[in-house]
Amino acid sequence: MAFRFGFIIALLTALLGAPAAKAQTGLEPGGIWLTQAGEAKVRVGKCGGGICGVVVWLKDPIDPATGKLQIDDKNRNPALAKRPIIGLSLFSGMRPAGPNRWSGKIYNADDGNTYASNISVSGPDTLRVEGCVGMLCGSETWTRSVR
């Protein structure tokens, strides 16, 4: 009887502990994230088999030189250079690359270039965003925003 009781306790511990372990490893990137510099908020969510990221807020939405909304004026493509930054899609082809990790490309509106990118959730409120040119990479940490 003692063996059976011990077996049941061990089984229950394993079964009840599994969801907690999965929650730790299954961190989701979905939500609104404040960039490291605090200048923009990006809504990250699932799309297709990967994730998408769209600018939803700017600290300074008005361009002081024009008095109008900030636009993608660093983009080399004249057709894209007039689109507003708010609503701009930053991620492309972001696909799962491991637990809590996605790889694809990221657009940088500050210089108008697209870079190879890796994104990883390192905690419930921490998103690491990395952009690379060849072997040179830079990264920043975004924090989850309430809105």
What positions do the PLM features span?
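Positively charged n-region of N-terminal signal peptides that target proteins for export
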Residues: 1-5
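Bacterial N-terminal signal peptides
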Residues: 6-17
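Sec/Tat signal peptide C-region and signal peptidase I cleavage site
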Residues: 18-23
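Central antiparallel beta-sheet cores of small beta-barrel/beta-sandwich binding domains
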Residues: 29-30, 36-107, 114-115
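Short aromatic-glycine motifs in intrinsically disordered, low-complexity regions
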Residues: 78-79, 127-134
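Acidic, glycine-rich flexible loop segments
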Residues: 104-129
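Edge beta-strand at a domain terminus
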Residues: 124, 133-147
